[in-house]
Structure formats: structure tokens, C-alpha cells
Amino acid sequence: MDNVFEFPAGLYGFPDLKRFVVVDVPGAGDVVKQLVSTEDPNVGFTLVFPFAFFPRYSPDIPEEELVAVGAESAEQVLLYAIASVPEDFRKATANLRAPVLFNPFTRKGRQVILGDDRYGIREPLFQGADRIPAEEGR
């Protein structure tokens, strides 16, 4: 998925940036990607495939969010989470509350804020792959 995507609504915190390229990270397969603005190359994010870290992650994507990227069903989109990776990568977290949807057919993307409070904005990537974040007292 090394392509340019149009984000008509921008990303949260960056509403004016509309075009981003998804860049492969060598050796990371589909688990880790980089999302870089084509309009401001100083703006970039680390993306993680959340299901690799949280196999029980099961976000309910509202139909209107799917329609916004030109998808008829959740099966037509790729879903990633924006990660924060500090110097000590073992403390990396993912924003499971606001995943990023990509429709590889329309080349449209959208960040979605879920109404599901089981998922937090700073979920540790390396603390228990079998858990749903809510099981940890959220």
C-alpha cells in the first residue's frame, strides 16, 4: 500500500492537509507504515495494523464513515491506528479510539473517532495481545 490518499477532511489536528502518502517501512510488512503529508513533508505519522497487537480489537465503523471513503462495507477498507513511538519503543502506544480508514480502490482516507469507550487514545502496544483495552479497567 505505497500510494497517495486523499483525506477530504484532513486528519485531526491537521485539517488543511489533504494528501498523504503511505510508505512501507523496510522489514515491517503490513504491520507498520508511515503516513506522510505530500503538502508538508514535515508532517508524518507512524501507523500500526492494530489487529497485530490487539487481535480482539473489533471497532464498529459507522456506515457514514465508510460512505465517506467510498466503501460499501468494512471489508473494502484497510484500518490502521496512529502510533506514538518514543525513544524507548517498548513504551509505544496506539490510538485505538481514532483509527484511520483507507479505501485502496478510491484512494480516499479518513480518520474516524469511535464512540466506543473500550478503546483509548494511548493503548500500550506491548502489554498483552489477548486483551481488549476495556479489560484493563477502562
Curated annotation (Swiss-Prot):
Question: A cellular component term (GO) from this record?
Answer: cytoplasm
By sequence similarity, the record places it as follows: Belongs to the FliW family.
Tell me the Gene3D superfamilies matching this sequence.
Answer: BH3618-like
Enumerate the Gene Ontology biological process terms: bacterial-type flagellum assembly; regulation of translation
- Its signal peptide is none
Transcription regulation is among the record's keywords: no
Protein keywords: Bacterial flagellum biogenesis, Chaperone, Cytoplasm, Translation regulation
- List locations, semicolon-separated: Cytoplasm
Q: Name one Pfam family in it.
A: FliW
Report quaternary structure and partners: Interacts with translational regulator CsrA and flagellin(s).
Q: Provide the coiled-coil residue spans.
A: none
Keyword Chaperone (UniProt): yes
Record-given protein name: Flagellar assembly factor FliW
Q: What does this protein do?
A: Acts as an anti-CsrA protein, binds CsrA and prevents it from repressing translation of its target genes, one of which is flagellin. Binds to flagellin and participates in the assembly of the flagellum.
SUPFAM superfamilies assigned to the protein according to its UniProt record, in alphabetical order = BH3618-like
